[in-house]
């Protein structure tokens, strides 16, 4: 009778290594960085078997983490707080550079020009110029003398 081929050992190691040898779960994900690998393993088993020890284990781990944080706080000296200086000038320069750029600034320049066109109130500007003209006409303003031909002397006052 021929041997059953259900349980083969052929190419098994290749299958295992196809995805590479994986890192521990604590190093695999950014969110699990610094978490005890033993704790993660226990969590897996606890999820698998739904044990009551899960809550106790979590409480113990939380205590350990808080103790660790306190120890780190005690060891690390507090740094001097530097005053935060706002970076206003660099933003202004970068904006100007963007506007001056031949391709990128095309739309920005168009928007600025459009804004200037729309924001300038034409009726107010005309009204202000008219008001200045009327105010200047009523007040006694010195009228400039008629221009003399080029090279002519200015007229002198006659003695009385």
Swiss-Prot record:
GO biological process, one term: cytoplasmic translation
InterPro entries to which the protein is assigned, alphabetical: Ribosomal_eL29
Biased composition (Basic residues): 1-26
Positions bearing Phosphoserine: 31
Pfam families recorded: Ribosomal_L29e
Membrane-spanning ranges: none
Biased composition (Low complexity): 121-141
Main location per the UniProt record: cytoplasm
Keyword field contains Cytoplasm: yes
Any GO CC annotation of this UniProt entry: large ribosomal subunit
N6-acetyllysine modified-residue sites: 33
Family affiliation: Belongs to the eukaryotic ribosomal protein eL29 family.
Xref: PANTHER family: 60S RIBOSOMAL PROTEIN L29
Protein name: Large ribosomal subunit protein eL29
Encoding gene, per UniProt annotation: RPL29
